[in-house]
UniProtKB/Swiss-Prot annotation:
It is a single-pass membrane protein. It comes from Brassica campestris. The keyword Repeat does not apply. This is Photosystem I reaction center subunit VI, chloroplastic. Disulfide bonds: none annotated.
Length: 145
């Protein structure tokens, strides 16, 4: 457990409750920090060097596969395994949606048309004034309305 001197040194002008008066509304006792201040030890100055690969080699002409990446993994000269009709369909109809702006316009138009359809097919008797009275009116004292 930390001693009182350590707490006073770390927290300058800390208030201690409950030392004077009642324990509920005790007077605060202010403690001055000790003359001994906490100073970090001197830091060493030096250049920061990032390590990449083995022995800080950034580009290796002898090993271009690891330097530039394995491009053979992704490119293939083999024919497409998909049906040509399916490929043509997706190239034709999905091409406009490759850009963000066109996709956003499509979503806005779709959302607007959905909102229009829902509002047109909803019933208009939502407000009480449109629905009219729901219960039979109560008769007055002489049996009249």
């Amino acid at each position: 457990m930390a001693s009182f001197a350590t707490i006073a040194a770390v927290q300058p002008y800390s208030a201690v409750k409950g030392l004077g008066g009642s324990s509920l509304t005790g007077a605060k006792l202010f403690i001055k920090p000790s003359r001994q201040s906490f100073k970090p030890k001197s830091t060493r100055a030096g250049a920061v060097v990032a390590k990449y690969g083995d022995k800080s080699v950034y580009f290796d002409l002898e090993d271009l596969g690891n330097t530039t990446g394995q491009w053979d993994l992704y490119g293939s000269d083999a024919p497409s395994p998909y049906n040509p009709l399916q490929s043509k369909f997706f190239e034709t109809f999905a091409a406009p949606f490759t850009k963000r702006g066109l996709l956003l316009k499509f979503l806005i138009l779709g959302g607007g048309s959905l909102l229009t359809y829902v509002s047109a097919s909803s019933t208009g008797d939502v407000l009480p004034i449109k629905r009219g009275p729901q219960e039979k009116p109560k008769l007055g004292p002489r049996g009249k309305l």
